[in-house]
């Protein structure tokens, strides 16, 4: 979301690339970073004082930040996604017509993304889930103003021209489905939690086996296998479908019958 740059260390040794710098110029509404040809506002900021021009994050990740904190939402997977390879050997794969799976509350949080067709959307990107939530703090501009709105989250996947398989969880808290031990385990924002209690603990509802298995499936399709396998998970094999789809345009005769 925020573009950053490196500077040497400030300890007197001057080691390269030791200090991470951002001026969050988007908030200022102008160029304030003293390095003239480098922008350290939001990647998406398209205003003329950005010397590098807009480079929205979804051009790489497939999704773009729109929902600000604090959110603690479940992930919803309707039956239309049940046949996707991503969900093989999960409860989602067994969904019937009209059914949907509602996965662990907190998977979507504390901030999350959408898939927007903003001119930078990667070609061939497709969805693996669909969750719509009302009354979220929704971005209104280049990264400074938020107001109540409705947003729809999707897990996404696409094949980059380099051959890389790019998965977009579009959420900070995907790890909540993998391991029950994490921060704000009850989903209560730290500023509202009991200051005398620990900030890191065991989520009483986590983890989520569906998320664990789907992640295992994803890694298998990327050519990565676990050294040891959790007992309740199913080994996953990589896809053998390596040919890209093709399309062709044919000119038909005027009297052709289809």
Regions from the PLM with identified roles:
Residues 42, 50, 56, 78-79, ...:
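Serine/threonine-rich low-complexity intrinsically disordered regions
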Residues 60, 65-67:
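Acidic, low-complexity intrinsically disordered regions
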Residues 246-250:
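Low-complexity, Ser/Thr/Pro-rich intrinsically disordered linker/stalk segments at domain junctions
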Residues 2-22, 29, 68-244:
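Extracellular ligand-binding/catalytic regions of CAZymes and related secreted enzymes
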Residues 251-258:
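Short, solvent-exposed loop/linker segments at the N-terminal edge
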Residues 3-54, 59:
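E1/E1-like adenylate-forming module used to activate ubiquitin-like modifiers
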